[in-house]
């Protein structure tokens, strides 16, 4: 395929990479145009790797950004050696479809900690290795990065899509993602160093706090507002934080808006001018799933329409920079989340759900 040939040439052009083709035989052709009226504002957080037809449909429907799980443990599976091949393929595909990556960087390799959810802040060598990895990632994929320079040699017509924002970790107020227990002070240190590293390479990039759900259901969890306040208590955080991530999962629209409002109020209270970014929001569409986030398909569509519409109406007031829906397609990935398997905008057969129609009504995109 054309993409496979391009990735093969990138293996030669970008030092230190071994790049396979990314699995599709489709000729990517010209860059897809993002449909609708909002460019990269609306995004998707997929729970599986979408195929090219998915990406084309997303883009036509007004999805202009894509939440990328940038896993340190995947890239540095062997201590001291980076394998970027999976992400070279992913960033290339997104650029071919005109979509902006929004990476959240997470996952400590087993060479440094026994669990990927144990942060690298406990050990100076691990913390240095994190900084080295993050620097390498931004040098590769950031503005004027090595990857985009190599792509331009092979395909000068392809428009680069470097991340506008880098999100540091995921839900660190939950012990699911921050073992053994959430620690706002340690997260502040992780964030501050990460911000310094990223801006040292790409001064125009935004560095965003991890999206947090206000009240995680895990042992030792910390309310996201309390957690964020303790992070801001550290010297230099207002300069380090460019945007604040929010995961306002809630059973109804009022609770969604309440979480966003409380986060915005805290940012204003501490005197920061950081924007907000909803990096995950969603509901399931199987009411038998046993969760207050499990609705009917019609209710899922209505909640999407009302919550995203209300947030859009208050975009300037809230300093809202983006909204990312979880997720694209109904698929059971085996995670311990009863409603997640039906959180898609399309069903398992990729047929439109009421939520996809509501989404494209909002964006002005094409649902087909």
Where are these regions (language model features)?
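Aromatic-rich peripheral "rim/lid" segments of glycoside hydrolase catalytic domains that contact
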Residues: 162-167, 172, 288-303, 313-368
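Noncatalytic carbohydrate-binding groove/subsite architecture in carbohydrate-active enzymes
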Residues: 35-37, 52, 131, 135-159, ...
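Bacterial signal peptide processing site
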Residues: 23-25
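Boundary/entry segment of secreted carbohydrate-active catalytic domains
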Residues: 29-71
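C-terminal motif of bacterial Sec signal peptides marking the signal peptidase cleavage site
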Residues: 18-21
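Substrate-binding cleft and catalytic face of glycoside hydrolase catalytic domains
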Residues: 58-221, 236-237
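N-terminal export leaders
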Residues: 1-6
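Hydrophobic faces of well-ordered beta-strands that scaffold small-molecule active sites
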Residues: 40-46, 66-68, 101-105, 164-168, ...
């Amino acid at each position: 395929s054309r993409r496979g040939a391009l990735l093969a040439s990138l293996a030669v052009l970008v030092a230190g990479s071994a790049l396979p083709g990314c699995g599709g035989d489709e000729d990517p052709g010209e860059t897809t145009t993002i449909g609708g009226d909002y460019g990269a504002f609306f995004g998707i957080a997929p729970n599986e790797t979408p195929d090219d037809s998915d990406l084309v449909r997303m883009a036509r429907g007004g999805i202009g950004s894509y939440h990328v799980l940038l896993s340190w443990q995947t890239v540095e599976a062997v201590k001291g050696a980076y394998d970027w091949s999976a992400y070279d393929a992913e960033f290339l595909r997104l650029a071919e479809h005109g979509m902006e990556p929004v990476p959240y960087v997470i996952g400590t390799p087993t060479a440094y900690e026994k669990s990927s959810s144990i942060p690298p802040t406990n050990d100076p060598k691990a913390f240095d290795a994190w900084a080295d990895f993050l620097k390498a990632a931004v040098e590769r994929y950031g503005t004027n990065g090595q990857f985009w320079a190599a792509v331009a040699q092979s395909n000068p017509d392809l428009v680069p899509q470097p991340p506008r924002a880098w999100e540091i970790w995921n839900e660190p107020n939950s012990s699911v993602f921050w073992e053994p227990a959430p620690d706002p002070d340690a997260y502040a240190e992780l964030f501050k160093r990460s911000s310094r590293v990223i801006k040292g390479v790409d001064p125009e990039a935004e560095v965003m706090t991890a999206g947090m759900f206000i009240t995680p259901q895990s042992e030792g969890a910390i309310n996201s507002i309390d957690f964020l306040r303790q992070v801001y208590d550290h010297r230099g955080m207002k300069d380090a934080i460019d945007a604040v991530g929010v995961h306002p999962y809630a059973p109804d629209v009022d609770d969604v808006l309440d979480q966003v409002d409380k986060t915005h109020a805290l940012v204003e209270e501490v005197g920061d001018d950081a924007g907000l970014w909803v990096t995950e929001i969603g509901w399931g569409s199987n009411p038998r799933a046993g969760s207050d986030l499990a609705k009917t398909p019609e209710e899922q569509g209505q909640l999407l329409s009302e919550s995203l519409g209300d947030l859009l109406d208050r975009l300037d007031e809230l300093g809202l920079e983006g909204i990312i829906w979880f997720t694209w397609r109904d698929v059971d990935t085996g995670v311990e989340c009863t409603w997640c398997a039906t959180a898609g905008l399309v069903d398992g057969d990729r047929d439109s759900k009421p939520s996809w129609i509501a989404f494209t009504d909002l964006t002005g995109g094409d649902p087909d």
